[in-house]
Amino acid sequence: MTAIVDIIGREILDSRGNPTVEVDVVLEDGSMGRAAVPSGASTGAHEAVELRDGDKGRYGGKGVEKAVEAVSGEIFDAIGGMDAENQVQIDNAMIALDGTPNKSRLGANAILGVSLAVAKAAAESCDMPLYRYVGGTSARVLPVPMMNIVNGGVHADNPIDFQEIMVMPVGAQSFAEALRCGAEIFHTLKGELKKAGHNTNVGDEGGFAPNLPSADAALDFVMSAIGKAGYKAGDDVMLALDCASTEFFKDGKYVYEGEKKTRSRSEQAKYLADLTSRYPIVSIEDGMAEDDMDGWKELTDLIGGKVQLVGDDLFVTNVTRLADGIKRGIGNSILVKVNQIGTLTETLAAVEMAHKAAYTAVMSHRSGETEDSTIADLAVATNCGQIKTGSLARSDRTSKYNQLLRIEQQLDDQALYAGRSALKALA
């Protein structure tokens, strides 16, 4: 009854107006799963490869007709008739069919779309929500949201070199309360920026992109907004950064074009340590560049005992790179992006490896998103305890938050909001 009888691929648009892949998987009993694949702006060099057509006369070369063709053609030919409940077998069959180490032949966008749609179809066939189907009976932890309320770097056209400044409502008693907290801070910040004469346009992920000279200046605005919204920074709400340092790492130096400063790896580590001493920052993502292993080690040794150091470009949701990082003792957390690795099976393996090594895991969106809310279910399924899915504006971001509200309501008194326990540094 759960045999795959049809796979339909199509080209749709993401939140930046670029094409992406959507997949429908239909089972013998009529159940159907649909998944849309996200896309990143700041991509790690070691990520799985999304297949683009390269035809400059169509979507500027960003079309995905080849990936869609692979979905309905080669991939369906290989896994049609297989049992959708055999997720590992199906994902492994697609990996073998592609035959490359980075899924570049068929495209990680094609493979991931099918992988997630298979899981959703199987969940529907079993009459179970996706988080329960993937995570089992223990899936009941609602994640702390990392809400990106100030955008910089490649996500915005402003001088702020860091890509994201986020608020984390760790003191809330429920996810719904955490979401309200974030929304109130977001609207307060908008008023504060407007009052100071700054624009309140939003970036790719729904956060504000004010023309501020430095991360310090942006952090000061956020701290003020937290207080004026009626919350206590460092108690109710903690701060998090995504430096996306690979984007401004040039010739062994960290070049802050907005600040007109250049820092060595040691100076970069000390600068981040200084920020954590002056602001209630409990999580820093990609504080060092993806291949600056010495820098990562220095940063981890300096503040890894008290701050969550998240590897995004460093680990790219890849168990091989994560295992190497664990062995080296660099970072203490992994950012989990399903499209960085390209299958649900490999994503779950990365989370499992992280948890076994006492690393935290943060489920994450991409800057180019869709209305698909699968990662909300996966955050609960994996008991990650943290989710990073943008600001409190743009429906491509709020779709994930709204799905988490539904899950919390469905779980009722079984729901457990992760709160401070999500972060080793606060536990």
Curated annotation (Swiss-Prot):
Binding residues for Mg(2+): D242, E285, D312
Active site (UniProt): E205, K337
A Pfam match: Enolase_C
Any one GO MF annotation of this record: phosphopyruvate hydratase activity
Keywords carried by this UniProt record: Cytoplasm, Glycolysis, Lyase, Magnesium, Metal-binding, Secreted
PROSITE patterns (alphabetical): ENOLASE
Membership in a protein family: Belongs to the enolase family.
The protein's role, per its UniProt record: Catalyzes the reversible conversion of 2-phosphoglycerate (2-PG) into phosphoenolpyruvate (PEP). It is essential for the degradation of carbohydrates via glycolysis.
Protein name: Enolase
Originating species: Afipia carboxidovorans (strain ATCC 49405 / DSM 1227 / KCTC 32145 / OM5) (Oligotropha carboxidovorans)
Higher taxonomy: Bacteria, Pseudomonadati, Pseudomonadota, Alphaproteobacteria, Hyphomicrobiales
